[in-house]
């Protein structure tokens, strides 16, 4: 049995393509892994504060000197960090906002990139402490950006996940979502085919998956 942590970061509850992909991913994953446990953290329903003086202070001062607000900030960060550390599989649903990730997802990373917990400073430089985990990134993009100079989303996510030791990362892009019905249909079809390929090449699958649609 594996633990699967899903992070939803779309600001929209309705009409969100990244949420659509997440729902399909979870549905088909459960068919193949019925015993796995899912935890979904929705950053739109439960927004996190941006990195601020309270959290920075809590990280850098002794516990007995924390104010009540600093304790709450640290407890939140600890809870989020432990969720990530306990997960075997991470699923990030990340629409592209202004060529990058939603600020809510950046805030989540700011809470869980913790020296001594998710990475450490070693003699040879920073070392990720979350080796052995897998990640799937489900993105929705209004235009077509993969492999181009305006795609600051995938390079950043690969770097930040690799920084904490997560190198087995699969990206599933739904592109052209705002370019008209034809582009949208083709973009969703490509994303679903990529998802099907990613799930079918999972060596732990014990049953064939139905067609993604």
Swiss-Prot record:
Enzyme class: oxidoreductase
InterPro entries: Flavodoxin_fold, Flavoprotein-like_sf, FMN-dep_NADH:Q_OxRdtase_AzoR1, NADH:quinone_OxRdtase_FMN_depd
Record's catalysed reaction(s): 2 a quinone + NADH + H(+) = 2 a 1,4-benzosemiquinone + NAD(+); N,N-dimethyl-1,4-phenylenediamine + anthranilate + 2 NAD(+) = 2-(4-dimethylaminophenyl)diazenylbenzoate + 2 NADH + 2 H(+)
The enzyme's E.C. designation: 1.6.5.-, 1.7.1.17
Positions of FMN binding: 10, 16-18, 96-99
Superkingdom of the organism of origin: Bacteria
Cofactor detail note: Binds 1 FMN per subunit.
GO function term, MF aspect, one: oxidoreductase activity, acting on NAD(P)H as acceptor
Keywords from the named record: Flavoprotein, FMN, NAD, Oxidoreductase
Cofactor(s) required, per the database record: FMN
Protein role: Quinone reductase that provides resistance to thiol-specific stress caused by electrophilic quinones. Shows a preference for naphthoquinones such as plumbagin. Also exhibits azoreductase activity. Catalyzes the reductive cleavage of the azo bond in aromatic azo compounds to the corresponding amines. Preferred substrates are methyl red, amaranth and p-aminoazobenzene sulfonamide (PAABSA).
Record text on subunit structure and interactions: Homodimer.
Family of this protein: Belongs to the azoreductase type 1 family.
Additional remark text: Rate of quinone reduction is higher than reduction of azo substrates, suggesting the enzyme is better suited for carrying out quinone rather than azo reduction.
Protein name as annotated: FMN-dependent NADH:quinone oxidoreductase 3
Species this protein is from: Pseudomonas aeruginosa (strain ATCC 15692 / DSM 22644 / CIP 104116 / JCM 14847 / LMG 12228 / 1C / PRS 101 / PAO1)
Gene name in the database record: azoR3
């Amino acid at each position: 049995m594996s633990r699967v942590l899903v992070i939803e970061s779309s600001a929209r509850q309705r009409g969100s393509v990244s949420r659509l992909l997440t729902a399909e991913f979870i549905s088909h994953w459960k068919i193949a892994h019925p015993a796995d446990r899912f935890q979904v953290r929705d950053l739109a329903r439960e927004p996190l504060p941006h990195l601020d003086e309270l959290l920075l202070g809590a990280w850098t001062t002794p516990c007995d000197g924390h104010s009540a607000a600093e304790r709450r900030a640290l407890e939140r960060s600890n809870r989020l960090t432990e969720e990530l550390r306990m997960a075997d599989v991470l699923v990030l649903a990340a629409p592209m906002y202004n060529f990058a990730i939603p600020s809510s997802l950046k805030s989540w990373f700011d809470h869980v990139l913790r020296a001594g917990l998710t990475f450490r400073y070693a003699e040879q430089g920073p070392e990720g402490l979350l080796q052995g985990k897998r990640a799937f990134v489900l993105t929705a993009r209004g235009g077509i950006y993969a492999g181009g100079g305006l795609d600051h989303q995938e390079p950043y996510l690969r770097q930040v996940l690799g920084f904490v030791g997560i190198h087995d990362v699969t990206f599933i892009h739904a592109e052209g979502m705002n370019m008209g019905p034809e582009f949208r249909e083709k973009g969703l079809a490509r994303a679903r085919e990529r998802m099907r390929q990613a799930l079918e090449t999972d060596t732990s699958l014990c049953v064939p998956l139905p067609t993604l649609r």
